[in-house]
């Protein structure tokens, strides 16, 4: 029973550690004495502007959404454990590709 409970706890921890998300809200700006809400989101990684109700992928493997309430970004991949000497995420596809850093030709 202890082993079963430990496996459930481990599975829960593993499931919650698969990726990261963050959110940001808009701040109203004063223009001509009136509060004006922005109509674009600014990508925090490359400072590009994105229209409301749009979705984009960043060069840092995040998928971001620009909503009326603000923006949210989440990893496009689930995290797996880091193994020293191995690369686990391809920055172009944001997919897991484990291979030795000293021999990238041997991909798994």
Swiss-Prot record:
InterPro entries reported in the protein's UniProt record: PSP94
A Pfam family the protein falls into: PSP94
Subcellular location as annotated: Secreted
GO cellular component: extracellular region
Domain of life: Eukaryota
Family: Belongs to the beta-microseminoprotein family.
Known function: May serve as a self-defense protein against the toxic effects of the snake venom during accidental envenomation. Does not show inhibitory activity towards brevilysin H6.
Coiled coil (UniProt feature): none
Disulphide-bonded residues: 21-74, 41-66, 61-94, 64-73
Name of this chain's protein: Small serum protein 5
Signal peptide: 1-19
Alphabetic keyword roster: Disulfide bond, Secreted, Signal
Keyword set includes Disulfide bond: yes
């Amino acid at each position: 029973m202890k082993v079963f409970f430990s496996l459930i706890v481990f599975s829960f921890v593993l499931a919650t550690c698969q990726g990261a998300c963050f959110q940001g809200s808009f701040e109203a700006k004063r223009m001509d004495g009136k509060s004006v809400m922005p109509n674009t989101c600014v990508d925090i990684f490359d400072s590009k502007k994105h229209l409301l109700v749009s979705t984009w992928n960043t060069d840092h493997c995040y998928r971001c959404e620009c909503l009326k309430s603000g923006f949210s970004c989440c990893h496009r991949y689930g995290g797996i454990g880091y193994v020293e000497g191995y690369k686990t995420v391809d920055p172009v596809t944001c997919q897991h590709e484990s291979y030795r850093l000293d021999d990238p030709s041997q991909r798994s």
